[in-house]
Design a protein with these regions (language model features):
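Active-site/binding-pocket entry motifs
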Residues: 17-21, 59, 130, 149-150
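Long, low-complexity intrinsically disordered regions
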Residues: 169-170
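Active-site gating loops and adjacent loop-to-helix segments of metal-dependent hydrolytic enzymes
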Residues: 3-41
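His/Asp/Glu-enriched, well-ordered alpha-helical/loop segment
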Residues: 31-37, 42-129
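C-terminal cap of metal-dependent C-N hydrolases
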Residues: 98-100, 120-162
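Short amphipathic alpha-helical segments and helix-helix/interface helices
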Residues: 1-3, 50
Length: 170
């Protein structure tokens, strides 16, 4: 797309949607040999494309396809880690992608995506610095959405899936 570098296009690589199929054993994923090879080809292209887009300066946002077996709805932080590990992002770039860039892609950056006077009061309060370890995002102390606080949010977690992903991404 010749307009991509001019701000008309954005990429949301969604690496967490495919990577588990290539990293977890077939005894866990229950995919066939053909599906595994196809997954490796697709995921290789996803990772390569994300890295190339990042190097070219394209607008890159963050998404997860959270309805998939190995993509829990509470684990967006893993997608940020994958962007850092696989696509050449720094932690600050990954955090900007999931906040300001996502808001810009969706056309709501005048209302949210950064902390500014007049914008919606949307923020996380964490117990550690995510620039040191993105996993600090896993257990926020406080979520404020449109000015409404939620202390120590506790989504239902899937310990078995979390353990598999911890091992796969180690």
């Amino acid at each position: 797309n010749p307009n991509a570098l001019r701000g008309y296009s954005a990429l949301v690589p969604t690496l967490s949607a495919g990577l588990p199929l290539t990293l977890l054993g077939q005894d866990t994923t229950s995919i066939t040999d053909i599906q595994l090879e196809n997954s490796k080809n697709v995921v290789g292209g996803m990772v390569s494309g994300a890295r190339q887009a990042h190097e070219a300066g394209l607008m890159i946002g963050v998404g997860t396809d959270t309805g998939m077996t190995f993509v829990p709805q509470y684990a967006t932080w893993r997608e940020l880690e994958l962007l850092v590990a696989s696509a050449g992002f720094g932690p600050a770039e990954a955090l900007r992608a999931v906040t300001a860039v996502n808001a810009s892609i969706l056309g709501v950056d005048a209302e949210t995506g950064s902390l500014e006077v007049g914008k919606s009061a949307d923020l996380l309060v964490l117990n550690a610095n995510p620039l040191d370890d993105l996993r600090a995002l896993e257990h926020p102390a406080l979520v404020i959405a449109a000015g409404h606080p939620v202390w120590r949010p506790a989504p239902k977690r899937f310990a078995d899936i979390d353990a598999l992903l911890d091992e796969a991404y180690a």
